[in-house]
Amino acid sequence: MYNRLITIYIVILGFIIPLSGYAQPKYEIRATWLTTLGGLDWPSHKATSAKTIELQKQELCKTLDALKRANFNTVLFQTRLRGDVIYPSAIEQFTESLTGHEGGNPNYDPLKFAIEECHRRGMELHAWIVTIPIGNTRQVKLLGKKSVTRKQPSICKLYKGTWYLDPGNPQTDNYLASIVREIVSRYDIDGIHLDYIRY
């Protein structure tokens, strides 16, 4: 009887042990932030003509190629900066980082292009959204009529010369959620990265 139980246990273990080798591999995120504010990481060329649009695109492709070679698999792409964005939006205007002029249309969709190029390289793109800071008084003036400080002043606060969305106001949640909804409904992004959730 004892020998029979030992044999049964050995047979059962013979089936169980090999199955443990088929566990799902761990997915590892190897990410970096790609800053568009002031062209810190990208773009260094302003999209003002067909030639400079192409230079802007080539620069992004070179950056993504370098990240791929360095074994990154995720790009946290700064999509909302300080009250402005890098895609055509019904809520906020284009950032001056793209054209040199706040609200200037770069005549292509940089977010769509970045997503396509990341996916072409087998990389994910997460939309990096700066949530609370809007900018100093000079920067907010440049945002003009489309600035959230003009459209929805009740959710904005000026503190020591810098404008912020008010995280204590429930309408701020609605405003930020509308930006996220706009992005996820229009683009094939792989994630959302919320940053500066503070004063």
Which residues fall in each region the model found?
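Conserved, mostly hydrophobic/aromatic
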Residues: 31, 67, 75, 118, ...
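Catalytic domains of carbohydrate-active enzymes, especially glycoside hydrolases
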Residues: 58-84, 187
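Active-site-proximal loop/short-helix segments
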Residues: 84-92, 134-146, 186-199
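Bacterial N-terminal signal peptides
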Residues: 7-18
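Boundary at the C-terminal end of the N-terminal hydrophobic targeting segment
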Residues: 21-25
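Hydrophobic faces of well-ordered beta-strands that scaffold small-molecule active sites
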Residues: 30-34, 75-77, 125-127, 192-194
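Aromatic-lined substrate-binding rim segments of carbohydrate-active enzymes
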Residues: 77-130
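Active-site-adjacent "subsite" loops/lids of carbohydrate-active enzymes
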Residues: 27-29, 35, 39-58, 116, ...
